[in-house]
Amino acid sequence: GGSSDAGKEVSKLVDNLGAVVITTTAGKGVINDNHPLVISGGTVRAEAREYISKADLILAVGTEMAETDNYVGKYPINGKIVRVDIDEKKINDNYQASVGLVGDAKETVKKLNAKLNNSVSLEQLESVKNAVIEIKRKIDANLTKSEKRHKKLLTILRKIAPSETIFSTDACQLSYTGVFDFNIPEARKWLHPVGFCALGNALPNAIGAKMALPTTPVAVLVGDGGFMFSMPELLSAKEQNLSLPIIIWENGG
């Protein structure tokens, strides 16, 4: 996402404002997904979008607010929008911004923080934390049978995988659930084909990530159908002597 390098600054902004954070798929990990105010990948869930519809102000940092981020075409936004983007053409793209701030996400948020003081009361903070807990409770209660199966595997995977692991995911059911039900500690640890939702990218992306960062664990999450698109690239991985755990979700694809 456009705020991937602004994690420290955005985290400070969240603490200053005491606001709920709903990340897009590409924004997963910009703030640690375990932060009590974060709903990771929440834009794909109706429960989080319902909360967005009730907000009087939306601060959108480095996001295109694209259709592929929410699955419904348009966010149900009724409040004002303050939008931060490095591309001035995006400030009013799809949604009219009440305030547009053109600039790099990291530097712009840093300037916002300089103007803010942490004036959030403990009572306000608890109220916001409880709102996040309730949204997550609703999400969990509304999981489909398939999503519950995914959750079991993802929970185990999160426990055993090192925190620094990069997960290269394909367009498959397992990773769709992982978008909102798999916590990532920092940006660029969850690679997903958000733009065109293309099949077959997980393995090639993982090979590239492992070659760029040979000491960092990299794992592949892919469906059986998507894996067939780029299975020959296993030869490339072998030629480079890469260690790449591949988790294939078999669902008749």
What spans do the regions from the language model cover?
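Phosphate/pyrophosphate-binding active-site segments
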Residues: 77-171
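Glycine-rich, anion-gripping cofactor-binding loops and their flanking helix/strand elements
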Residues: 1-82, 185-216, 228-232
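Active-site diphosphate/adenylate-binding microenvironment
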Residues: 10, 14, 132-215
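Short, ordered loop/turn segments at secondary-structure junctions
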Residues: 1, 26-27, 86-87, 249-252
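Thiamine diphosphate
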Residues: 7, 52, 92-94, 100-102, ...
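Phosphate- and divalent-cation-binding pockets in alpha/beta enzyme and binding domains
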Residues: 5-9, 67-69, 111, 156, ...
